[in-house]
Design a protein with these regions (language model features):
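Small-residue-mediated transmembrane helix hinge/kink sites in multi-pass secondary transporters
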Residues: 75, 116, 154, 181, ...
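Hydrophobic transmembrane alpha-helices of multi-pass small-molecule transporters
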Residues: 61-64, 176-180, 210-214, 286-289, ...
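Helix-terminus/linker motif at the lipid-water interface of multi-pass membrane proteins
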Residues: 32-50, 119-126, 182-193, 253-286, ...
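Short runs within selected transmembrane alpha-helices of multi-pass transporters and secretion channels
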Residues: 70, 139-157, 165-173, 198-213, ...
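Short alpha-helical transmembrane segments in multi-pass integral membrane proteins
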Residues: 1-23, 77-144, 190-246, 302-367, ...
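Small-residue-rich hydrophobic transmembrane alpha-helices
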Residues: 49-109, 146-165, 276-334, 338-340, ...
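Transmembrane helical elements of multi-pass membrane transporters/channels
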Residues: 18-37, 138, 149, 172, ...
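Structural signal for membrane-spanning alpha-helices in multi-pass inner-membrane proteins
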Residues: 111, 154, 180, 184, ...
Length: 446
């Protein structure tokens, strides 16, 4: 064991906070984009909020693809630097940028092609349909800057620099926050663009993040650089990038399919129900994914001590992380339960939305603790090289248990059944996660 490494000797509790604070802030900033957009757009009309809500699965899938390439590049560069293979690390940087631009352009084109049939399947309201097209036609162009800035962020983080990438993320969020009201409502010299203004502000935020990311990458002090001289495309390296980032893509993409599936149930009730779920889900994502930043900080600690054969510190990190995650999820649950009306007011909720939305938020918030526990167990499996078990838990959470629960409870309790499906699915997932963990312990492989 490397006794001079802080992963091996630092107090576990203090180490988790040190490793978690930046990912936690990063996740909070990343998921504040959609919440800010929705909060301002809701002041235009409920139909505008519904349009943004219908667009959310597409933008989520785009983000998942960005994370796919970003994580793959991150893991590959970190490995090469650890092996002191500087040239291979620089070659990976160039491949990552080419993939970010190429895949980003492809997704831009695909989103423009599918958005008409996609929105047509989810709403019969002509105004919502047109607003959705208007919003997504601009947001489609966010994919290249989004994918490039996330790729560069992960490249720089692979060198051990966790702080600098956070600043260009903050800059993008600030631009989005400032320009949203200016462009949506036409304040001062800015034109009133309505829902188009929200999408323009989002793209502007990502563009600034990309420009600052490039400036940072091209700086003299960076440990990795873009390789141009004697560069040639390596198919094996591209395949490794995609393979290494695939688990992260699956975990992030599942929420996109889940939201689309829920919307297909909600469309049978009302557009207000879709607008509500879109607003609520952004609040939930902000809470859950911020906590996920804490979990990300636990992962390298558990992974290091598993590799070092230090089972006591591995289990200590898992227990301490589980306690912190539970505490934060309970805090999130209490916040939603005590302040549902105030949270809905962020989205200028109509009386019709409030009539079912307040109780619906309280029902769905009951799932947070179970979600946190199952995600922590899934991360433990990821750290101990049991990727199959890790992915199985994520599939249970957002697909295998949720879909049947939605179908059955919708039949039994109508609209309330849809909200009940979330805590039911999360509880079942947590039980399965505990059973899988007990099985691994019984086999003495944990």
């Amino acid at each position: 064991m490397q006794t001079n490494n802080k992963m091996a000797v630092a107090p576990v509790g203090k180490l988790i906070w040190q490793m978690s604070i930046l990912p936690l802030i990063s996740m909070f900033l990343q998921y504040s984009y959609n919440l800010i957009d929705s909060a301002f757009v809701a002041r235009l009309s409920e139909n505008a909020l519904t349009a943004v809500s219908l667009s959310f699965p597409i933008t989520t899938l785009m983000n998942a693809t960005s994370i796919w390439i970003g994580v793959g590049v991150n893991v590959l560069i970190a490995g090469y630097l650890g092996e002191r293979k500087q040239d291979e690390a620089n070659t990976t940087v160039t491949h990552g940028l080419l993939l970010a631009f190429g895949v980003g352009a492809l997704l831009n084109l695909l989103s423009l092609l599918i958005m008409r049939p996609y929105f047509g399947a989810l709403t019969n309201n002509e105004e919502i349909y047109q607003l959705s097209l208007a919003y997504m036609s601009i947001c489609s162009f966010m994919q290249i800057p989004n994918m490039v800035h996330i790729a560069i962020q992960k490249m720089i983080q692979a060198t051990g620099n966790m702080i600098a990438p956070m600043w260009f993320q903050i800059a993008g969020v600030v631009v989005n926050f400032v320009f949203d009201p200016l462009l949506i409502f036409g304040i001062g010299v800015f034109p009133a663009m309505g829902i188009l203004g929200a999408s323009v502000a989002t793209v502007a935020g990502y563009l600034l993040s990309m420009i600052l990311a490039f400036a940072l990458l091209l700086g003299k002090k960076q440990k990795v650089r873009i390789k141009i001289k004697e560069f040639h495309i390596q198919k094996r390296m591209i395949a490794r990038i995609f393979a290494l980032g695939l688990p992260s893509f699956i975990m992030n993409a599942l929420s996109s399919f889940m939201v689309t599936f829920v919307n297909l149930f909600l469309v049978a009730y009302s557009d207000t129900a879709i607008a509500f779920f879109g607003a609520y889900f952004k609040v939930q994502q902000l809470i859950v994914m911020t906590v996920n930043g804490l979990i990300q900080g636990c992962l390298p600690i558990m992974r290091f001590n598993y590799g070092a054969g230090n089972r006591d510190r591995l289990h200590s990190a898992f227990r301490y992380g589980t306690a912190l995650v539970s505490g934060m999820m309970i805090l999130g649950t209490l916040t939603v339960n005590f302040f549902p009306a105030q949270l809905l007011e962020l989205f200028t909720a109509s009386e019709a939305m409030r009539s079912f939305g307040i109780s619906a938020m309280r029902i769905m918030a009951a799932s947070y603790l179970f979600c946190g526990l199952s995600t922590m167990i899934s991360t433990y499996f990821q750290a101990t090289e049991k990727v199959g078990s890790s992915i199985a838990i994520q599939l249970c959470r957002q697909l295998l248990f949720l879909v049947p629960a939605l179908w059955c409870l919708n039949k039994l309790f109508q609209l309330n059944g849809i909200w009940l499906a979330f805590p039911v699915a999360e509880t079942a997932t947590m039980l399965i996660a505990l059973i899988i963990m007990a099985w691994h312990r019984h086999k003495n492989i944990l």
